[in-house]
């Protein structure tokens, strides 16, 4: 299945996964950009940076196979294999970034918006009863097994 066919499949988990990939870049860039604020925003930017690395392992399953990680971390990441669990973690990460507006309004709101959109996509996939379908481009559905 090509990338265009994946998007035409109307499976919201595919949309959520690609929104999650966009969140990786946004969280990393905005976390670095906001880490130099002299206010309490630094804590939220660090959380945003950590979120970007967690999302990398959630959305790109191939990395769990090629990166040396601990069994505890692997078990933690594997908890987010269903649409509802992914919606939950994206929702929590989004709420944390929405709270970052309290000390000072910064560009972290963009990360909050996109994390919320990813959570909505995964929640819609769960509500519609769609099975989680990983994108082949990101290492889902057999790509990891082909490398090993």
From Swiss-Prot:
Species of provenance: Phaeosphaeria nodorum (strain SN15 / ATCC MYA-4574 / FGSC 10173) (Glume blotch fungus)
Glycosylation sites: 11
Record keyword Ribonucleoprotein present: no
Predominant place of localization: Golgi
Gene encoding the protein: TVP18
Function: Golgi membrane protein involved in vesicular trafficking.
Protein name as it appears in the record: Golgi apparatus membrane protein TVP18
Family: Belongs to the TVP18 family.
InterPro entries, per database record: TVP18/Ca-channel_flower (IPR019365)
Keyword Transmembrane helix: yes
Protein's membrane topology: Multi-pass membrane protein
Keyword tags: Glycoprotein, Golgi apparatus, Membrane, Transmembrane, Transmembrane helix
Cellular component annotations (GO), alphabetically ordered: Golgi membrane
PANTHER family, per database record: CALCIUM CHANNEL FLOWER HOMOLOG
Cellular compartment(s): Golgi apparatus membrane
Coiled coil location: none
One record GO biological process: vesicle-mediated transport
TM region positions: 12-32, 40-60, 82-101, 107-127
Domain of life: Eukaryota
């Amino acid at each position: 299945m090509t990338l265009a066919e994946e998007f035409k499949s109307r499976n919201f988990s595919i949309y959520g996964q690609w929104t999650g990939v966009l969140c990786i870049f946004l969280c990393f860039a905005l976390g670095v950009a906001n880490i130099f604020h002299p206010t309490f925003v630094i804590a939220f930017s660090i959380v945003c940076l950590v979120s970007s690395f967690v999302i990398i392992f959630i959305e790109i399953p191939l990395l769990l196979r090629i990166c040396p990680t601990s069994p505890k971390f692997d078990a933690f990441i594997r908890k987010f294999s269903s649409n509802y669990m992914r919606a939950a973690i994206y929702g929590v990460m989004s709420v944390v970034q929405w709270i970052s507006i309290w000390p000072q309004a910064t560009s972290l709101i963009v990360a909050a918006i996109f994390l919320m959109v990813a959570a909505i996509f995964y929640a819609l996939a769960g509500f519609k009863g769609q099975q989680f379908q990983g994108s082949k481009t990101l290492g889902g559905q057999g790509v990891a097994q082909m490398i090993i």
